A protein has these predicted regions:
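Non-catalytic substrate-recognition and accessory regions of acyl/acetyltransferase enzymes
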Residues: 1-115, 119, 123-149
């Protein structure tokens, strides 16, 4: 049984968690995901949110980083009940279960090193199998990728 349930990008419980995430652009906004294909997951204890995003392949729009895969745009875990790396793996399973094409670049995320309180930024993603693949265009974030088999 998964710790996650699907919700929409307008889910107020998820938006409240997003308000406390370092990537939040506008605190209090009713939504927190970019346009395109999304899968938003809320933990069963409502203490964690995970958001997958990909430009809709039918739109012709490409991701600014040139990668073709699903990007975790937000992951906030305030839960003590679940290990973050296990939650990431379950979020990947949920995405596959939806039947989406994962894309040749697999699973993608960025971690803003200076905004996380960790000596090893992205550690939970690394435990879930992600590897460092460079930096964001502005140089502020570490790019982590996990190929999809």
């Amino acid at each position: 049984m998964s710790c996650w349930a699907k919700v929409t990008k307008f889910d107020p419980r998820s938006a409240a968690l997003a308000d406390r995430h370092y990537s939040r652009r506008k605190v209090g906004s009713p939504q927190f995901m970019p346009p395109g294909q999304t899968l938003i997951l809320l933990s069963d204890g409502e203490a964690a949110v995970f958001g997958w995003w990909r430009p809709d392949p039918k739109s012709g729009i490409k991701a600014m980083n040139g990668l073709d895969g699903w990007t975790c745009t937000i992951f906030r875990n305030e839960s003590l009940a679940y290990v973050s790396s296990a939650m990431i793996l379950e979020a990947e399973q949920m995405l596959r279960a939806e039947g989406y094409d994962i894309g040749p670049d697999g699973f993608i995320t960025y971690v803003w090193d200076k905004k996380v309180n960790s000596a090893n930024p992205g550690y939970c993603f690394k435990l879930a199998g992600y590897k460092t693949r460079g930096r964001s265009a502005d140089g502020k974030k570490t790019l982590l990728i996990k190929p999809y088999p």
